[in-house]
Amino acid sequence: MGNWSRSAVVLGVSLMLSGTAMGSQQGGAASGGQQKIDTATKTFSVKLGATRLIYNPESAGATLAVINPQGYPILVQSKVYAEDKQGNAPFVVTPPLFRLDGNQQSRVRVVRTGGTFAPDRETLYWMCVTGVPPKADDVWGQDKDGKSQAPKVATLEVQLRINSCIKLMVRPSSLKGDPADVATSMTWTREGSKLKASNPTPFFMNLKELSVGGKKVEGLEYVPPKGERTFTLPAGASGKVQWKVITDYGGDSREYQSALQ
């Protein structure tokens, strides 16, 4: 679940030749010379202005900053997914697709379109934003003079598109405070070689750190509200459980301690 927040997609391998490069290549072939073709791997991504969105279902929407760190324009695609990261969600993102110039920032707005949410706990969705690179013949990828801003040299290019996803937490207005305020309520139980985390609160507990007797627990995932999650105990682990959670602002909470039951 944590790894899904940034996933790479290989768009393809393309040979990009400008008119000048093509002419030089043809001329070189006639004279027995060879055109040098550069190879490059480019990663196209966007930076997001928050690590999570807290959405009040009674509000008019929530906004998120989107930054293009590349030096050329990209298309920005945005969509909200269900908790399983596959199904549709009762939200629309506006604009769903737009051009964002190089080294510029814009904002998208998430608006509820329907759905029924639990009144006594948070509901989780995923907000995903993807940057799409321009092709040589894309009109939207041209500068103000109508010139393409795609690479102008003969380049064998592998393009990697990065999906940037953050949690969208629907939090009813009846829930007050921050998950970090009640994270101490979590309990921990040994079940053989497993560690069961129980979360009696109405908030998702996004674990930042977890250890038992000073031994680090790997493979951390969130613990759902009024639910449980099981982790693998480190070999020989015993003693106190220590943990930290991620706050609403994306920072680390203080450290909590509890006895292992």
Please name every model-derived segment.
Residues 66-70, 195-201:
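Asparagine-centered strand-capping/turn motif at beta-strand->loop junctions
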Residues 115-182, 239-261:
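Terminal connector regions
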Residues 1-11:
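Bacterial N-terminal signal peptides that target proteins for export
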Residues 26, 47, 65, 69-111:
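Surface-exposed binding patches on compact interaction domains or structured appendages
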Residues 10-19:
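Bacterial N-terminal signal peptides
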Residues 21-25, 29:
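Boundary at the C-terminal end of the N-terminal hydrophobic targeting segment
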Residues 30-65, 177-190:
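Beta-sheet-dominated interaction scaffolds and their linkers
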Residues 88-116, 215-240:
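Intrinsically disordered, low-complexity Pro/Gly/Ser/Thr-rich segments with frequent PxxP/GP/PP motifs
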